[in-house]
């Protein structure tokens, strides 16, 4: 009887100890590389919401709109939707450059000529109060040309990577171009924006200057 009690006690302690041991087994070894975003949730953005941004841009004559701005630990990721209409020749001083934020374009529809290069002619500081500077892509400059720039004919399905400090300049748009933009913000210079803020923005006309 005494032996049976001992066996039962051992089994009980083994049973309650196993979950703890299993938990220890899945814990990250503190000497291993650690996640740079601790217990961070993923983010999903449905295509229907992105399409609402494009329709809003067309209806309200907007160009660049921020859909999300997400903290991923050591950086933030912005998701933007951009709609540009027909452009026969570039506007004056329309070269853009961002000091701290890199951008990735995924072209959804349309086609355009995009010039890229770091040597910007007649560099002019963007006002720090501009909405795009404050909320979208941080401080940067405009310019009148890109010295030695390379012109790319971009179309639906193409991807463009624009490092911080690289000038980018639309010189011709056949009819329109729509693209999704990923903004990489390692210095966290732009404010966060979640789903609730996005849906609220979409529910009413954009304020003047947006």
Residue ranges of each PLM-predicted region?
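A short, N-terminal "cap"/entry segment at the start of jelly-roll beta-barrel domains
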Residues: 22-98, 192-200, 204-210
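A short hydrophobic beta-strand segment most commonly corresponding to one strand
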Residues: 175-191
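Bacterial N-terminal signal peptides
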Residues: 7-20
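Short, conserved beta-strand element in jelly-roll/cupin
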Residues: 99-118, 128-142
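Conserved metal-binding segment of the jelly-roll/cupin
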Residues: 153-174
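Short alpha-helix capping/helix-loop boundary micro-motifs
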Residues: 144-149
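N-terminal secretory signal peptides that target proteins for export/translocation
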Residues: 1-4
